[in-house]
């Protein structure tokens, strides 16, 4: 507990000139720029065909994630069968990457000592390979015995899918790491863009920088740091990005540079704050038709395919128990500091299940055609569905929910008809809003005000009975009245349409969602309990959810 965890993410194009005989990447002597710190001191050099070997030797990460594209596919024509699917493409690309690591040798020099071996021997036990969807036309080569085979590859897809698929995969993998490691003193993510091609570096960087702030906001802090600082502070989360100098021929010296170091969070300071979008509609769209690719693949069936993909998206939403309105309110609760509503709308869907099912259905809607010719094979891949922005919006909300619920002090907290204790709400504030000093102060003050007002009027209230917060504030008025902010009580009835008024919407947001007319309070078992009175009228829950997410951008 309280350890430092390092994750190395490496983006690669195709390392093979002719799979599996000759490499495209040259053997280089990798050295490190002065600003890079190595765990056991810098080696004199690392001789290898990839920066992965050098950075692994320097950083000693516990986890290694390699990101490749389906566009590096090569396939022996004799092994192609009629049922060859996109899942087979993924497995073949994973094998292509793994085979490179098994065959690529490396040499490390430290002082007068040398270490030689193969990259896979160093990283294999900690390796995850993510094969993200690409797009374009490619000519790849492979050797089958003494024969050279040309693989002409056409991949029809959306660049947005590379980003979305990668973010979902990284979210699931990173959550597994956080769950496995427990509380941390530091989480360091090292992003190596040296071997990325075309759009890969930019979209990978975007995926990582969109994901890390969500993790940083709610992650459990290690005990060692708490003791060292003398007070509870959050884990330090860093992102270091690397790039190397070009390698033009075997034997070139290439210096690896740290081109950026971003402290995503240190103490109460954020280099990047978490940001959320809300689903585009009450039923999130997790898959949409890729019209361009569908019309290329099946020009007379695009309409039918569109209905199929739309129905599949709806089935996914039902299967995963997702509600766009609740998810939007949850996003608003995180962004606007609404602790009671945050618990009331907390998703129950597991992120791992979500990622597995969404990406599985995405892959099932990829069509793979091939034709074998003399000394060549033509493979055409059509992504009939795409991953819209709703997919990302939901994934980030589920990730936030999972990390918040994983905190030991919140493991047994939930919203029910019995309400939530004030003690638990204060614990939630410490976790869910510690990334924003403003939200933490506001929510804590509002909870303190409820406690103060209750204690001031406790003689006239019966223990164990729910009382509207408005009645507690307006001690002179009958049940159902409420007091505006400031001055002497000027009470008015708590009407069903209270949130139709703009000033009451502002009051709801300014007072952490603890609106005097909507919150019920009771004291029981020595603690104060709160809940929403959504029974005031049937439209009230809808109104609360709509007001809660004011200011957030809708995914489109």
Predicted regions: what they are:
Residues 1-187, 203, 209-556:
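Long, low-complexity, Lys/Arg-enriched
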Residues 188-192:
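Short helix/strand-bridging catalytic loops that position acidic/His residues to coordinate divalent metals
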Residues 193-201:
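Acidic, metal-coordinating catalytic cores used for nucleic-acid/nucleotide bond scission
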